[in-house]
Amino acid sequence: MNYNQPATLQAAILDWAGTVVDFGSFAPTQIFVEAFAEFGVQVSLEEARGPMGMGKWDHIRTLCDIPAIAERYRAVFGRLPSDDDVTAIYERFMPLQIEKIAEHSAVIPGALQAIAELRGMGLKIGSCSGYPAVVMEKVVALAETNGYVADHVVATDEVPNGRPWPAQALANVIALGIDDVAACVKVDDTWPGILEGRRAGMWTVALTCSGNALGLTYEQYKALPAAELERERTRIEQMFEGSRPHYLIETIAELPAVVRDINARLARGEMPQGN
């Protein structure tokens, strides 16, 4: 039996917060700040956004490893934060996250239309998130009331290693019955999510304006003067350089055009691993 390269995409694997729901990715960010505050440790929104895309325990561990935050923790507790301390913060983070998730559950403008167009092109819709399953259960239910249902969902604690490891993306490949990772496109607003797709051998699309990197509401984004938006886009594109996305677009609304371009490249024999 011979290997035949895929001729078209078979699936889009979409992130959740900052990609399909929660423009600006506010739900997780604010809760990190609140969870640390309950332990008397100040963390800014900007600091909290840094590791976004990772599983939430890993995110907290990464924050605790930042020297400035570690020193604030030491000032309160007289020691650097251990893994047990990270777990204590995580266990406070979780109920706060579940309680507040509905406040940031709106579907991103243009997402439903874009996803419908992808389905019309024959793509299945997989999804994964840095949220654990207990949070994703609520996120998925809220999204369904707003008209979005993915064909498959993988939470960060349903695989051995979350992002930037490729396990969640590959779990979607298996569940959706996709026969070649090169027939998948991973879409995300964070560098760990893009690395996840790259490591899984997929096409990757980074979102520059709807998620964590820009960190604005939809209304704030639309109100940005053109020159300021261009500066922000340049900054964000530089931030993504290390993860090497194949495409950078502002929001998921532009995704159908990217899919058509990828299909044309596949038809020419191009593969994601070679670009």
From Swiss-Prot:
PANTHER family found in the cross-reference section: PHOSPHOGLYCOLATE PHOSPHATASE, PHOSPHONOACETALDEHYDE HYDROLASE
Keywords: Hydrolase, Magnesium, Metal-binding, Schiff base
Broadest EC class assigned to this enzyme: hydrolase
Subunit field text: Homodimer.
UniProt binding sites for Mg(2+): D15, A17, D189
Family that this chain belongs to: Belongs to the HAD-like hydrolase superfamily. PhnX family.
GO molecular function, one term: phosphonoacetaldehyde hydrolase activity
Protein name as it appears in the record: Phosphonoacetaldehyde hydrolase
Cofactor(s) the record lists: Mg(2+)
Free-text cofactor note: Binds 1 Mg(2+) ion per subunit.
GO CC annotation: cytosol
Main function: Involved in phosphonate degradation.
Biological processes annotated in GO: DNA repair; organic phosphonate catabolic process
Gene this protein is translated from: phnX
